[in-house]
Amino acid sequence: MPAGLSYSLTGNPNFNTDIGGFFCGSYNTRGSGSAPKNPQFQELYVRWMQYGLFCPVFRSHGADAPREIWQFGQKGEPVYDAIEKQIRLRYRLLPYLYSTAWQVTSNNDSYMRPLFSDFAGDQRVWDMTDEFMFGRSILACPIVDPQYTEEKIIRTNAMTGWDRKELTIDNGQLTINWTDAKTAVKYLPKGAKWYDFWTNQQYNGGQDVTLTTSFDRVPMFVRAGSILPLGPEMQYVGEKTWDNLELRLYPGADGQFTLYEDEGDNYNYEQGQYATITFKWNDRSRQLTIGQRNGSYKGMLQKRQFTLVMPDGQTKQVDYDGSETSVKF
């Protein structure tokens, strides 16, 4: 994480890692390529996938062992399901990520943001390296310590040393209950209110919160005032159109978000073939304004719907034809 944040600070925004580590031979404890069956590697891989969820490029790659999801088990089993959950969420976040990519290329923004970039007045975050902003709305708080297997991580000044302990296996078998609930303490930066992405519970900033965590969920929060677009579940990019995006609204502050769209598979945007829609939330009036669509490109949706979702469960459907419209809650 410190490496990714440092790269962003140097003007290199498209950082990524080999999820699971390029070399994993020391986890092949039962023969060549057996790492995906090793509980230590399974936990490491799932947690690394959860970190990769918030990297500009989400990529599994490496040597010593295969990394396909089915190498870790089958659907219905905890490790497989945890990996699948991260992949599905990444696809749902594509409208947010693609729009952030436009801000990166057009406005010199960044995907991974050290917390002091947005909360410079909060001294607690000045040297924090295990939490960061993913875009302007999402506070990423990956789990960086093993919770289910014995593995000791030693940190010194954000540099990681590694001291792997062998697991004690009775009668040659190791049983781990991946469904056990654990806890993690995360810090919420001062100067904003925050919503737990999974539960919608609201918190004030400037405090540590103790979370009940699970193997398949990465701790993540959304800043009050955010407008978070989520797309449909997909098997691959372009499988489904964005004709009914879910817009999650997080009251507690004014906010805005610009949705960026283009053809998605060429460089025609460099010739101005793209469209943007700006959403603005007025917290005092509890009103969302969906602005007039600007620009166009081949294959652009002329009419669409947006499903607006509030943390308390309120939902409204909006038909949109490119003209400005407003919705009150």
Label each residue range with its predicted role.
Residues M1-D216:
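Catalytic-domain carbohydrate-binding cleft regions of carbohydrate-active enzymes
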Residues F215-E324, F329:
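Accessory, solvent-exposed terminal regions and/or long lumenal/extracellular loops of proteins
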